[in-house]
């Protein structure tokens, strides 16, 4: 089943764009008493995948560790300094890139055509333009492409979670070569991009200092 349209939600608690974006902070210690039910976690992901992706390939995959067993698996691949997050968060979401997303590309656009979103001519044009590039691509290209798509989704997930009233911590400190197999996925297909702890902060997070924009900008 392909849901191409963005999901509208009734769970948004904070619809203040400025607050969601500019007051988001990473949290390392969560309130362990706070639990997020799976229905809301699924809604958060449903909203997350309205993020943009190259050629609408949607090259992302999510593993949600929200049980004791799942968290134990997550902890087994995390670096020790990230244990406080997994021990206290409501759930940890691993965002992975799917290097084989192009194999179902026809299904996505055929569905769009059936629903009258695009004409058969436009669909065929899309197939001719983009599919050969991916079908003949190197593994390195497919991995890089999937990581870009999934990075877009990961950032969106941080903001969607905050809009739902939750705090997050994006994590890259894990054994990347063990993530897929730990969760029963094909490591040749799925490449880990980020782990995201989600829950409610146990205390007010520290505000970080940022570089001035002029220090990291070039105009030409």
Where are these regions (language model features)?
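Acidic, surface-exposed loops and disordered segments
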Residues: 2-220
